[in-house]
């Protein structure tokens, strides 16, 4: 009864008003799975290809009708009659159909939509939630959220070099409590910014992007907000940064335009981070070096890898081949997981499993262009990854993931677990 009888894709809009792919997979039993594909703003050079039409007369060239056509005509013709529960075989067939390293024939957006919709249809067929279908009885760990509450860098027009400032309510006893703490800090930050005369409009991911004077001021207003919300920095709440250092890198140096000494070598940038870690309760730094500066990554990992989580996003792009090379070279100690960077569910699960075997942490992440699709909420619980990065406590395209996690926590009941600070198991 899990035989695939129809596959249909359409062009829909993401949270930034850009087209993306939505796929529906229908089974013989009448079950249906639907998945919408996210889209990144700042992307790694080695990410799987997001296929766009390039037709300037439609959506400024960002249409996805080619990818939609690939689903409706190429992929559907091959997969009709397959059992949707054969996820690994289905994903392997998609990879073979595409035949390229970076999914450039069919488009990772076409392939991922089909891959996820098949999994959702199978879960529906079996009467299971997606996290239950993917994780079985062992999938029960609710994640510690990274709430992106303040933006700089490429995500904002201000004097802050670092792209994302996040709070992690690691002192909470449950996901529900962690989310409440994060939301309260978000509102407290709004009040702090207003009091200082700053704009409180939010960006793509729901974080504030005021015209702050420096990286230091960004950290200071967040510390003030944590205290104003009634929490203790370093005890109840930890900080995480996404530097997006590839955006700052040119000619072998990093340009932090708003620092006293703007141009920094990898060693000097590492010292800059070490100083921040000494003075603020920072537990995680993502993309602290440029994706191609592997020597810089090694310097950073050697100096801070025992103290904080060092996350590779653009560095690894959820690609097990690249990730294995990083593990072998002792680079970073964590991987950011983005489904559309690699293009199939199976390859995503393999990356998470590889991280665990190597003693790395895995942080499941959204993209800046999101939809109402909540797949990553189920994925993070199914895999017991322990951490999720899906924006601020603002904007429905972000909050829908948090709300799905609240539902999952309720559904699990006494079986649910939440590890708080212990998610950083490789720092103990």
From Swiss-Prot:
One of its GO terms (cellular component) is extracellular region. It catalyses: (2R)-2-phosphoglycerate = phosphoenolpyruvate + H2O. GO terms for molecular function: magnesium ion binding; phosphopyruvate hydratase activity. It comes from Syntrophotalea carbinolica (strain DSM 2380 / NBRC 103641 / GraBd1). Its EC number is 4.2.1.11. One of its GO terms (biological process) is glycolytic process. Its main location: cytoplasm. NCBIfam families: eno. Belongs to the enolase family. Catalyzes the reversible conversion of 2-phosphoglycerate (2-PG) into phosphoenolpyruvate (PEP). It is essential for the degradation of carbohydrates via glycolysis. Gene3D superfamilies: Enolase-like C-terminal domain (3.20.20.120), Enolase-like, N-terminal domain (3.30.390.10). The keyword Cell membrane does not apply. Binds a second Mg(2+) ion via substrate during catalysis. It is found in: Cytoplasm; Secreted; Cell surface. Pathway: Carbohydrate degradation; glycolysis; pyruvate from D-glyceraldehyde 3-phosphate: step 4/5. This is Enolase. It holds the Pfam family Enolase_N. Its cofactor is Mg(2+).
